[in-house]
Design a protein with these regions (language model features):
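Alpha-helical assembly-interface signal, strongest on the long, hydrophobic N-terminal helix that forms
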Residues: 2-76
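Long, compositionally biased low-complexity segments
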Residues: 63-402
Length: 402
């Protein structure tokens, strides 16, 4: 009997010990999970706190969220935020804190373009994106004088500095062959359309002035031309528009029987005989160029020019093209087509996206250095951070992104 009681006591002792072990293990596990959950919340909050320190100027003026700082500065901020919360917690040993914006720096223009499009979509739904007012109305008192960027340090630090330029004239000439694709430029909601709305809202152009202080007057022209002066960018866009209009106008001349007959009569009068054919070609080119030159003047003065013309929207007769118009703009009888900003949209729509985004970032940097912070650099800005933390020998890793 005593032997049985002894065996039962031993068995109960074993069971009790096992239960105590399980209980202690559960208590330890709950404690570790509590620490893990608490650490997760603290580090997440610290990361969000870093993102909350976005550049207020860029957000207010351009709708973009950027954080500034190198890895050392960001890691220091993260450590400060974590230790502020954990400093009095004896059960938390913070062993490593690291934050890096390396994967999110705006050297990658795709990241910037992604955020621009996200902002444009939101702003469009809220009806916040509108074209800048025309320089002839709200803009006269705000319009800047023509400027040239001459600061060597500012020039070499531009985001587009290392991107090879592309020929804007060739781009414009190629658009003349895209008659069936022009409607795509103005299709609401497309990526190209959203980029155009963003650009026309936030940046000046020759005919319109955006809100806020800006270094260049011809900013949209800068996005297209990439030159360092207002005058040169205006000239590059002027050449591009004429290059677009010339083949379209030449095609109309040859498609219009009345104009073909006028060419024939004039060429026979100037060079009768075999040379008349060559003269006719030269006259047609002269006429098309004169009309193209007048088209650009019309656009600058606020008139509209159709992509493909008819007799009613044609402005210059053959005599006027040959004699020259002494700088006078000829307004056609029929007003229809696209205005200057819509022609800018055509060029922007077919422009290389990487180059376009880089030049948008150029302008943000130029304007920030001009009126906000003379040391501002896009190359020091990012749209997110990677976080690596070790607490109590456990690793925690996060990605935080706007």
């Amino acid at each position: 009997m005593n032997s049985k009681r002894g065996s039962s006591a031993v068995f109960l002792s074993v069971i009790l010990a096992a239960l105590m072990t399980i209980t202690l293990a559960l208590i330890y596990g709950v404690r570790e999970e509590t620490i893990r959950s608490r650490t997760d919340s603290i580090v997440n909050l610290a990361g969000d706190s870093i993102l909350s320190e976005f550049d207020s100027y860029v957000q207010k003026e351009y709708g973009l969220f950027l954080i500034r700082g190198n890895d050392q500065e960001l890691s220091g901020k993260l450590r400060k935020y974590i230790l502020y919360t954990t400093g009095s917690m004896e059960d938390m040993d913070v062993q490593k804190v690291s934050a890096s914006a390396g994967r999110f720096l705006l050297a990658d223009t795709d990241l910037a373009r992604e955020q621009i499009l996200e902002h444009a979509r939101f702003a469009q739904t809220q009806k916040l994106l509108s074209k800048a007012p025309s320089a002839g109305s709200a803009g006269d008192e705000k319009k800047t004088s023509e400027r040239t960027l001459r600061d060597g340090a500012a020039i070499v630090s531009l985001p587009s500095a290392d991107i090879p330029k592309r020929n804007l004239r060739e781009l414009a000439e190629s658009i003349a062959d895209k008659k069936d694709g022009i409607d795509d430029v103005f299709q609401a909601g497309s990526e190209g359309w959203l980029m155009n709305q963003y650009i026309l809202h936030y940046f000046n152009n020759k005919n319109a002035v955006a809100d806020g202080e800006h270094f260049f007057q011809n900013e949209v022209e800068y996005i297209l031309g990439g030159e360092l002066s207002d005058r040169k960018n205006e000239k590059r866009v002027e050449i591009a528009l004429k290059a677009m209009r010339f083949p379209l106008n030449l095609a109309h001349i040859y498609a219009d029987p009345e104009k073909r007959n006028a060419l024939l009569v004039m060429s026979e009068a100037i060079t009768p005989g075999a040379a008349a054919a060559a003269t006719q070609l030269a006259l047609a080119a002269t006429w098309a160029y004169a009309e193209s030159d007048n088209d650009v003047e019309l656009l600058w003065e606020g008139y509209k020019v159709p992509f493909t013309k008819d007799s009613g929207s044609w402005a210059i007769d053959l005599d006027g093209a040959i004699e020259g118009l002494s700088g006078k703009t000829v307004v056609p009888d029929v007003q229809k087509g696209y205005d200057y900003e819509q022609y800018l949209q055509m060029l922007l729509f077919f422009q290389d996206g990487g180059m376009q985004t880089a030049r948008i970032l150029d302008l943000i940097q130029i304007n920030a250095r001009y009126c906000y912070d003379g040391e501002f650099l896009i190359s020091e800005c990012g749209v997110g951070i990677d976080i690596d933390v070790i607490v109590n020998d456990r690793k925690y890793g996060y990605e935080k992104k706007f």
